[in-house]
Structure formats: structure tokens, C-alpha cells
Amino acid sequence: VMQRISRGVESSEIDFVPSPTLLIETHAIPFARRAILYQEGIRLVTPTIPRVPPRFISPRAKTHNYLNLILGELEAQASDPEAWAVLLDENGNFTEGRGSNVFFIKDNVLSTPDGQFVLDGITRGIVLSLAANLGLSVEERNIDLFDAYTADEAFLTSTSLCICPVHSVNGTVVNDGVVPGPMTKQLMGAFSDLVGVDFVEQYLSHLSHSE
């Protein structure tokens, strides 16, 4: 379920005060199509299109203007239709994907792009809280491609994915392709315990289905 609110339709009348337009949409989660991701991991690609800099549009505001992210996604999927795009900023640091946040793990330290430069997704926040409760070391910092290519583990978070492991970044395989890695698996279990649903099993139960 998604809620969208706009400022309403503008009028030429001087004293016109627009009233908000409210839209509520529902979308079916593509369980069958995504189920394999929990066995094989996501193939993550960083397109050449950079994320719009925060000085132009703050990424912390959920404006539903996804054009920049969609263009990056289209570029990534032109070379790999199953790829998930995460855009870099103008300095070559990771930002976010369309509706997703990215995490990397190196030497038992969990890192994610600074919340000042991404939309602070609800699932992202939950994962940071879970990591703190589990006593894991967490950093919000600049993460470049070298960090990604040398990571021990990686995963994406989103409302529908929850936590999904990453198999590779631009073709560079993470953790010899073993997914999920141990810390990712620990966080996935903690997330399932928190929400009261084994979301991985929920996805995997659709493996034999088609959508």
C-alpha cells in the first residue's frame, strides 16, 4: 500500500488556495520473481548516471520523483535485465537505489551511506537498530567502489525486500558468491523475529510459482 500526496492543481485565480490531492495505490509484491534472489543474491550494478546532488534536491525528502533513479535502473538493466541499480554520487560514493538502501560488511563492521545523502528508509533504520542491539559495529560513511569490491558481504534493504543479500557488484563477486553471509544472515533472522514473519521462507515458498 502506497500513499501519495500532491499540493493539488494550481489555478490562475489570485485567491486560490490549492487543496492536497491524495492517492492511495496497492501493488502486489512479486514474490515468485524475486524468490531466487534469496538463494542466489542480487546482481548489483552502478550505472554511469550519478545521483542528483543534495544541493539540488534533498534525498531525505520523499518526493516520489524517481526519474534520476529510473534512468540509472534502465541503464543497468540494458546490460543485465536482472540487475538492481544503486547510483553513485558525483564523487563516486554509493547513495541508493530506487526504493532501496545498500549495506556493506568488511572485517565485521557494517557500513552504509550517510543518512544525510540518502532517503532514510524505514527498513534501513530498523537494520541499524537491530545491528546496535546485536552489538555489531556500525558506520555511516562514504563508501566507494573499492570498498564494495573488497567487501566481505553486502545486502539491500527495502520495504518489500526486507533484507536481501548481494551476489556481486558490477560483476565482482562478493564472498565467493556465498549468500547470505554470516552477518547478513544474523540480521535477517533478527528482522524476522522482530516482525514475526520469516520473510525469507515467505519468498522461497513461491519458488515453484510463476507471476
Regions found by a protein language model. Give the residues of each.
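Phosphate/pyrophosphate-binding loop motifs in nucleotide- or prenyl diphosphate-using proteins
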Residues: 3
